[in-house]
Amino acid sequence: MSFTVDDRVLALAGIAQALQQVRRIADTGHSDAAAVRTAVESVFRVDASSPQEVFGDRHALKAGLRLLHNYFRSQGQDPILPKLALSVLQLERRFVQEGETVNKVASGIERAQRQAAELGDSGHPDVLANLGGLYADTISHLKPRVMVQGNPHYLGQAGVVAEIRALLLAAVRSAVLWRQLGGSYWDFLFSRKAMIEAVDRQLA
């Protein structure tokens, strides 16, 4: 199956949207519930092979697409977010090379998915705590570590930390998808115009 730049920008939007919520929670202690659910549910769709299967309707990624639209035009408001995204893309490369870690994450995701089904809510605090703990026990030990800055008051709260880690797991999942769709660092150098046009099409 062949994939296009339109598919790849959706995966990048998934990364951007998850990390936007990471930044928001770290600074304010609050998140957008719909964006968090989109991120968590993308983690549960581990066997999906296309961004449509992973994220559903592209409108679920509207915030992420708008972020890409702004950053590709050097209009991004948060200079830290692109640095986080780069760290996630680098971390994904290390993660997929660690077979034992990949297997542990896959098993943990299955358990969290069953929990979400029982609770009837993929964004339930217990589900976020489960996924956050999974990230802490596995991917967080790999380098480069994704360093999240924010308000110490909120970063000292267990629930906030768990939600941030769950969203980082979702960002890594989107990074894996981006690679599976043929994404590479060269895209940002040689396919920038095509990526901008693809983002605009998705937002139309």
Swiss-Prot record:
InterPro entries attached to this UniProt entry: HflD, HflD-like_sf
Record key words, sorted: Cell inner membrane, Cell membrane, Cytoplasm, Membrane
Alphabetized Pfam families for the sequence: DUF489
Statement: the UniProt record of this protein carries the keyword Membrane: yes
Membrane topology qualifier: Peripheral membrane protein
Chief localization: cytoplasm
Compartment list: Cytoplasm; Cell inner membrane
Cellular component annotations (GO), alphabetically ordered: cytoplasm; plasma membrane
Residues forming coiled coils: none
Superkingdom in the source lineage: Bacteria
Family: Belongs to the HflD family.
PANTHER family registered for this protein in UniProt: HIGH FREQUENCY LYSOGENIZATION PROTEIN HFLD
Name recorded for this polypeptide: High frequency lysogenization protein HflD homolog
Source organism (scientific name): Stenotrophomonas maltophilia (strain R551-3)
Gene symbol of the encoding locus: hflD
